[in-house]
Amino acid sequence: LYGYIEWGIDKLLEKIDGMYAISIYDKEKEELFLARDRAGIKPLYYGNVNGQISWASELKAIQKLYENQNILEYDYTAFYDFLTYLYIPTPKSMYKNVYKLEPAYYLKIDVRSNNFEKIQYWHLEVKKCNDDIETAKKKIYDLVKKSVDEQMVADVPVGFFLSGGMDSSTVVALASQS
């Protein structure tokens, strides 16, 4: 919250690193901000159902909110998507007027007018690499090692699930060096 007060939403989201789904209500401006991490690790659902704004990290919380009102309608196109892709693509959910916020986006909601504005706050930059193979390997190693080291900072023991693939094996091998 101090970051929002000091820098505003755009600068705050530029500075935050990690997994998150956050909500900030600015009482003075009567604006609600909902934001999701860059990689989309933490989910964030939001809805505008009959003029009621709702949000939660799990869809079942929004279902529970409206269960006695019987106002949630199924979005049948989402079911078709599920049968086609075996998941419901973002931003859809199984309900009309309830959505999953995309990774690296935030939602600015003017509470007075119920106006929703979706803003992408981060873009993945793809840069051409002109390094030779050895330099490129070293850079990749250093970046992955730094990322793993940052995730190893915890106040409880850290465990791993191994799929047997290259990615999980690489992470565990690097973590064992920390």
Residue ranges and their predicted role:
Residues 1-178:
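Cysteine-centered catalytic environments shared across enzyme families
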